[in-house]
Amino acid sequence: MTRSILCFDIETIPDVEGIKKLGLVPSGLSDEDVVAHITKDRLENGKSEFLPHYLQRVWVIGCLFKDDRGLKISCIEPSNSDSTLEKAGLVKLSSVNDLDEESRIKKFFNIIEKYSPTIISWNGKGFDIPVLNYRAIVYGLSAPRFWDQGESNRDNKFNNYINRYHRKHLDLMDILSNFSSRSFASLDHMARLSGFPGKLGEEGSNVWNQFLSGKEKEVKAYCETDVVNTYLMYLKYLKLTGSVSNEEYQDLISEIKNFI
């Protein structure tokens, strides 16, 4: 395995403020009515109810980080979070404006700045990273190491996070499909077919309703399950490509089982 890896997954909600700013809905609507209105409008015009990437806001970022020191699985917390209050159930997001999205995204890119890990995703190049990039632009964030394609470090010219065919960002869905959208498969289905748990509980399509209900804890658990499944599929990929032996694969599987 590489020196350090970061499996990640994001859960998003509609960018209500962005929708209002662009004049896509009548003024004076509540957050809930904004989303209901634009969803209805899109469906009536033959579009998907799923909003485009640039109209998504990042609510949860789940991460599995592994290096020589071991494993860590968690969701990135905003700078103003108070774990004691959160555990006591005293912190609840009451509106989109309470979401410290900027802090979460900044921390995600800071992990890359500090460790330069190989990042692992399932459809991360198609969804997660474009959303993170758009939101980082909106907030005026800086992520030079993520964007470096050899300008600062010559080695990054040949293996960087941006090039679709490089392995610095390994999008498992993309590479296993041989970069063909006609062959894409869901993480849940492939994980279950491979003998892993797959998704447990909530579906990504239900995140907005979970947000309105203040169920951040449940969505975090759902997101962390996704990153674990992504990591397990990554281990299968390492075995498939001969990057690890069968014995090494079994050791890595035992490690994650014992950790969980």
Language model regions located:
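Entry/capping segment at the start of metal-dependent catalytic domains
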Residues: 1-58
